[in-house]
Every structure is written in C-alpha cells, then in structure tokens.
Curated annotation (Swiss-Prot):
Protein name according to UniProt: Ribonucleoside-diphosphate reductase small subunit
One Pfam family in the UniProt entry: Ribonuc_red_sm
Function as written in the Swiss-Prot or TrEMBL entry: Provides the precursors necessary for DNA synthesis. Catalyzes the biosynthesis of deoxyribonucleotides from the corresponding ribonucleotides.
Active site per the UniProt annotation: Y119
Keywords: Cytoplasm, Deoxyribonucleotide synthesis, Iron, Metal-binding, Oxidoreductase
Subcellular location: Cytoplasm
GO cellular component: ribonucleoside-diphosphate reductase complex
Assigned protein family: Belongs to the ribonucleoside diphosphate reductase small chain family.
Binding of Fe cation 1, residues: D81, E112, H115
Gene name of the record: rnrB-1
Residues bound to Fe cation 2: E112, E174, E208, H211
Cofactor note (record): Binds 2 iron ions per subunit.
Length: 338
C-alpha cells in the first residue's frame, strides 16, 4: 500500500484532467458503471411514502420521549443530506475526472435531494407547532448534538486534506453517522409503529448503503492509499461522535433500546466500512441486533418483488439477445445484493 505524502505533487489517475470526460462510451470502468446502473434501478420519489396512518401512531402510540427522539433524528437527517450534496457538487463532481463516476455522483445528488425532501416532509407532517418545526429545520444551528455532527462533516468539504481522506470521511458520514439513527427507526418497525417513517427508512438506508459501497469502490481505484493509522484515527473520531449523539445526547434509551448494544452496533458498522476499504477491523465488534440482519434480508426480498416490473418497463434490467460480450458489463444483473 503506497501511502500519501501531502508534499508530493503526485495526482491520482482518476483525478487527472481527462479530455474524454465529456463522452461516456466506451466504458473504461465497468464496475463503476454497474454501480451507477444499480443506483439508477433503485430510484424512488417522496410521493411513494404513505403517511396516512403515521399521525395516529405519533399522537396516540408514541411517548413524549419517543417523539422527542424521532424528531431530533429527522432533524439531523434533513440537514445531513444537504451537507453530502454540498460536498458532491462543490468538490467530488469537479475533482473526479472519470465519466462513469460522475454519472453516479450526478444521480446520487438527485437521490439525496429526495431524501432531504422526504425528511422535511416527515417533520412537516408530524410537528404541528411552528416554533418547534423551525428549530428542527435549523437543527445544525439550534441543536448542539446535531451541530457537532454537522461540523465534523462540513470541515471536510473546505479542508485541504487529500482526496483520499475526504473520500473516506464522507464514507464515514454515510456508513457510520447514519448507522445508529437507521437502526433506531428499524426498532420502531420491529414494534409495528410508524409505517410511513419506517418504509422511508428502508429505502433511504438502502440508498446510503449503496453510496457508501461506491465510495469504497472508488477508493480501490486510488494508487496511493491512506496509512492505516490515519484511517483508524478518522474512523474512531466518527464512531465517538456517533456514540455521543445516539447514546448520550439523544440516548436510544428514550425509545427502549439499550445504549450499550447500540454503541456496539456502531462499532460493528465501522468495522464493516474499514474492511470494505481494505483495512483490518478496529473494534472486532459483532452485531448485537440479530433482527437487523433479518430486516436486511426482508428488505432485499420485498424490494425485488415490488420493483422488477418497473425495471423492465424502463429497460434497465433488460439484456438484449444479440448483445455482444464486451457490452455485457453495462447490463444490470438482478441478483446483486442491495
């Protein structure tokens, strides 16, 4: 593993100015192209979320603590997608010179906008008091625990650190900073509450998982990787920030979950990310929530049952009978693990 020297003038091949960046074909990175097609096939819109029964659960089935917890989680999510998009639009889209990756980033921006719209719609639906609603919509300024997470992510946008470091940082945002909140909402699904919220959580967590996978894939294209010590420090910082948010400032105890188990789950997610980046585990923590594995399997099954017809309709999943072998890399295969 060749390590990064910040004083070096070396430029990664995927960041070098590329005169062919405006033309897509021929595909030079088929694995990145497949990832883009995979993202394209999972497209959805906020109007698909049925919130019809959520208000009843919100008013009559949730406790004050549960409402407080959910509203603050939604406030963080509503701001975080905008932060991710800020980075994509102002840094990554212009830095990365390969068109296949730009296709993915362009679509990711659209999906993050849908996420942001969905979270804003959820807050708009559940929160009736205007003052409370305004506070949640401005959470990165008004709520300290959310402000701290936002500042961690924002500093990487304007930072002069290497592309590799910033790529890993935003993989940590999507792979670690979202993990505790996603898990807590799945806990509500396990209890049969808030069907609209939990369905949107399924869709969004799937999307963010794919975005994180893409960051890891792009990292493999870098010739000079980060020193393991740099990776460990970044990941530990992100883990501590997420633990403080979901186990202390906004404790999952409020919704009946165990903070110690949640802390372990965050470490498990961090280890999964580190391994995907090509490094050794840091925490060696197992998944304390077996039901999260079951939800993942159910999500994959239900997703395909409901969406395959739509793929065929748009031609995304269709492989022509006469397609040549060298074009097969551009076909979405529906046995991929979402």
């Amino acid at each position: 593993m060749e390590e990064i020297n910040k004083k070096d003038t070396f430029i990664e091949p995927i960041l070098k100015e590329n005169k062919d960046r405006f033309v897509l074909f021929p595909i030079k990175y088929p694995d990145i192209w497949r990832m883009y097609k995979k993202a394209l096939a999972s497209h959805w819109v906020a109007e698909e979320i049925d919130l019809g029964n959520d208000n009843v659960d919100w008013e009559y089935k949730l406790t004050d603590n549960e409402r407080h917890f959910i509203s603050h989680v939604l406030a963080f999510f509503a701001a975080s997608d905008g932060i991710v998009n800020e980075n994509l639009a102002t840094r990554f889209m212009s830095e990365v010179q390969i068109p296949e990756a730009r296709c993915f980033y362009g679509f990711q921006i659209a999906i993050e906008n849908i996420h942001s719209e969905t979270y804003s719609l959820l807050i708009e639906t559940y929160i009736k008091d205007k003052q409370t609603k305004d506070k949640l919509f401005n959470a990165i300024e008004t709520i300290p625990c959310i402000k701290k997470k936002a500042e961690w992510a924002l500093r990487w946008i304007n930072d002069s650190d290497s592309f590799a470091e910033r790529l890993v940082a935003f993989a940590a945002v999507e792979g670690i900073f979202f993990s505790g909140s996603f898990c807590s909402i799945f806990w509500l699904k396990k209890r049969g509450l808030m069907q609209g919220l939990t369905f949107s959580n399924e869709l969004i967590s799937r999307d963010e998982g794919l975005h994180c996978d893409f960051a890891c894939l792009l990292y493999t294209k870098l010739q000079r990787k980060l020193d393991p010590k740099v990776i460990e420090k970044m990941i530990r910082d992100a883990v501590e920030c997420e633990k403080e948010f979901i186990c202390e400032s906004l404790p999952v105890d409020l919704i009946g979950m165990n903070s110690r188990s949640m802390s372990q789950y965050i470490e498990f997610c961090a280890d999964r990310l580190v391994v995907s980046l090509g490094y050794k585990k840091i925490f060696n923590s197992s998944n304390p929530f077996e039901w999260m594995e079951m939800i993942s399997l159910q999500r994959k099954s239900n997703f395909f049952e409901g969406k395959v017809a739509e793929y065929a309709k748009t031609g995304v999943a269709i492989q022509g009978n006469n397609q040549q072998k060298n074009n097969q890399s551009r076909t979405l295969v529906l046995d991929e693990d979402f």
